[in-house]
Amino acid sequence: YRQSKFKHEWRDQYLVTHVIYRLKKTYAPDLDYGNIRASLATKNIEHPTAQQLRDVIIEIRNAKLPDPKVQGNAGSFFMNPIVEKAKYDALAALYPGMPHYTIDGEHEKIPAGWMIDQCGWKGKSLGRAGVHDKQALVLVNRGGATGEEIVNLCETIRKDVKQKFGIDIHPEVNVK
């Protein structure tokens, strides 16, 4: 869903109104993503059912993300950048403990939220637009923010991350 013709060449031509999911018949959960395994351990669940896994994921997301009915937001605003291993190694030497996810032998994914937090943006605002206090990937409307204010905050954060880490982060949200 992150990359498709609907986000690129068909962006202004089509509106998706329905989807069909093709689900696997065999249940094979990925428990190594984020805090899933730790959350399951606190509940003494070793082999979760699909329902238990769903409940844990919803619990994790609700703890980190603001309710859009209460505070305007579009969820994760930035994509996590994938960098070459040499770039990651150089940054890891400067920032021990920097989180990352190995993509393959030549690439690492660095959490954009971590970089935004390291730039001091978590919980901060620029005008009426701000960065959520629990998840730096989420930009929020503090009340009455315009699209221009959200874009200005986005671009300011992108500039700060580029200056500090030498990495371009890109919005996941389509902004016009």
Describe the role of every protein-language-model region:
Residues 161:
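Conserved ATP-binding N-box helix of the HATPase_c
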Residues 1-148, 164-176:
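Phosphate/pyrophosphate- and phosphate-bearing ligand-binding catalytic cores of soluble enzymes
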